[in-house]
């Protein structure tokens, strides 16, 4: 099991990173309006999360809210994100997770609205860099019931589509969680384009197994080992 303290980011660094990633999510069209939320583990039992009711394009370091894993606000003037429960259920179950990103990437969310999972065997980069993307059944956003929907899908997944809602990604660091969100949306665009041209061709099963094994072998709790992995670069 991963050491939770090894996934904690110093508070000052976490504040800067969250603001930077919020800007990127907005600028790249992965969120709009007051959509989305971002959090980072800053201690064994606490996280830093974006506030409710504020555009992520405008969020500042002082707007962020420090919350205990039991949901108690420890520091901050604003209310924590309405999707706090989803973040907390991931952190509690996954000590390897150091950051969580929730966004509404248009194409990936289109798959979620259609009730269509992303194929787990179509793109080497998705198999290796993200792994299988779970499709979580719909529940009202901002509720504990939605967080409970995640429970069967927490182990073995670092990315989730929420039916009729959006996407969530997790990683050992905010950089990785954000990259996974971009990868999920990029994969969704490619798969949609492929369906417009013809039929999505699955990778050979042997290739999927090899890529999945490489992802597992060269990552410890989601963190890449120092030796160079077998990584697709095409």
PLM-predicted stretches and their roles:
Residues 1-234:
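Glycine-rich flexible loops
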């Amino acid at each position: 099991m991963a050491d939770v303290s090894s996934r904690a980011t110093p508070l000052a660094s976490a504040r800067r990173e969250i603001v930077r990633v919020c800007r990127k999510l907005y600028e790249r069209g992965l969120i709009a309006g007051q959509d989305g939320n971002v959090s980072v583990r800053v201690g064994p039992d606490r996280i830093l999360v974006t506030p409710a009711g504020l555009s992520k394009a405008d969020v500042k370091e002082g707007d962020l809210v420090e919350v205990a894993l039991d949901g108690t606000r420890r520091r901050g003037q604003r209310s924590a994100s309405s999707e706090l429960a989803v973040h907390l259920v991931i952190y509690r179950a996954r000590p390897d997770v150091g950051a969580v990103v929730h966004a509404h990437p248009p194409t990936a969310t289109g798959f979620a609205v259609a009730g269509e999972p992303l194929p787990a065997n179509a793109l080497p980069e998705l198999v290796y860099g993200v792994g299988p993307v779970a499709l979580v059944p719909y529940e009202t956003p901002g509720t504990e019931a939605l967080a409970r929907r995640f429970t069967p899908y927490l182990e073995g997944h670092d990315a989730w589509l929420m039916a009729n809602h959006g996407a969530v990604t997790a990683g050992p660091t905010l950089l990785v969680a954000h990259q996974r969100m971009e990868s999920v949306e990029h994969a969704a665009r490619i798969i949609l384009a492929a369906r417009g041209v013809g039929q999505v061709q699955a990778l050979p099963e042997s290739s999927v197994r090899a890529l999945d094994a490489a992802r597992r072998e060269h990552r410890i709790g989601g963190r890449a080992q120092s030796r160079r992995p077998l990584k697709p670069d095409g």
